[in-house]
Amino acid sequence: MRTMKVLARYFNIYLALALLPGLVASCETGKKKAQTAALRVHIEALPDAAGTSQPVSVLRSEPVLVNIKKEPILTEANLINAKVIEARGGFALELRFDENGTWLLEQYSAANNGQHFVVFGQWGEKRSEGRWLAAPFISRRISNGILVFTPDCSREEADQFVAGINEATKQIHKGLLK
């Protein structure tokens, strides 16, 4: 009989532990989940037989095909922060990179004058959905670590992207400090 009581007590503990995640999740349903986003900055490249480049379509209203290196040169891991800024005729995105990102931005902009950076972004509830946001022309060496461009998105989408990318950047830097 005593064995049954002990087994019943363990069963109740296991049952409580099994139900705990569901109870915690139901308590958090009122909280808004933090948005995250992803950023990939690629560099324009010539088509190659080795398969290291690919053509992408940038801009939705008047699509332009740009051939890029498949591997991004910069990501959200290189960011310090992003913000939406006022620009002539609307708004632009300003991406401020860390020391390594600043160095990469300077090296690639100096070596690829006359070509394009191609920016890909993902944001929102289904981050798997994303698109090519811009292909800013490289007209000079960028030594200050700041890339500014006009994105192919609405102001609301830009605000969501910036909030998500800043949250992702904060999470990355928090993980690096641990």
Question: What is the predicted role of each segment?
Answer:
Residues 1-25:
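Sec-dependent bacterial lipoprotein signal peptides
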Residues 2-6, 27-178:
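Structural signature of multi-pass, alpha-helical inner-membrane proteins
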